[in-house]
Amino acid sequence: MKRIVLLRLGHRPERDKRITTHVGLTARMLGAEGMLLASDDQGIVHSLEDVVRRWGGDFYIKNNVNFKQEIRAWKEEGGKVCHLSMYGVNLPDVTGELKKCKKLMIVVGAEKVPPEIYQLANWNVAVGSQPHSEVAAVAITMDRIAEGEPLEKEFPGAELTIVPAERGKHVIENIRE
């Protein structure tokens, strides 16, 4: 089974809370096991933990991490690092290699990322070679490298479950014991 974790760099609490939350939500939905936040923002932690509590799964978030230490530890444990931006090799050119990774850290920045990220990453990947959203970069990349069908994944322990329907909103409240 593939392990994917997301590392979020450069989060600015007053400016980026919504986009960082959406990056985490997208990573969770598409199969990441957790998010490492290289900033201190308890609001993001609480928002994502609340989603996991209500909608299920085992997604975790670590707040205020040292990105260099996290990357080094990940690589020492045999993991690979993929930095997503609008610079680097084109995503279609490395999709096959990324699919083979059993342990992958996906790095996305908010503001200008520290230059050493380009050296620490195994791949610097351009998602479209045009300005874009971090949410889009994570979604496109994770969809391209997905094992199975993450859009059909069930999240264990959910309090709420959406029932697919052609029209309307159908939500089941699950009983927990």
Swiss-Prot record:
This is tRNA (cytidine(56)-2'-O)-methyltransferase. It comes from Methanosarcina acetivorans (strain ATCC 35395 / DSM 2834 / JCM 12185 / C2A). InterPro entries: Alpha/beta_knot_MTases (IPR029028), tRNA_m1G_MTases_N (IPR029026), tRNA_mtfrase_aTrm56 (IPR002845). Its EC number is 2.1.1.206. It catalyses: cytidine(56) in tRNA + S-adenosyl-L-methionine = 2'-O-methylcytidine(56) in tRNA + S-adenosyl-L-homocysteine + H(+). Belongs to the aTrm56 family. Specifically catalyzes the AdoMet-dependent 2'-O-ribose methylation of cytidine at position 56 in tRNAs. One of its GO terms (biological process) is tRNA nucleoside ribose methylation. GO terms for molecular function: tRNA (cytidine(56)-2'-O)-methyltransferase activity. Keywords: Cytoplasm, Methyltransferase, S-adenosyl-L-methionine, Transferase, tRNA processing. Homodimer. PANTHER family: TRNA (CYTIDINE(56)-2'-O)-METHYLTRANSFERASE. It is found in: Cytoplasm. Gene3D superfamilies: 3.40.1280.10. The keyword tRNA processing applies.
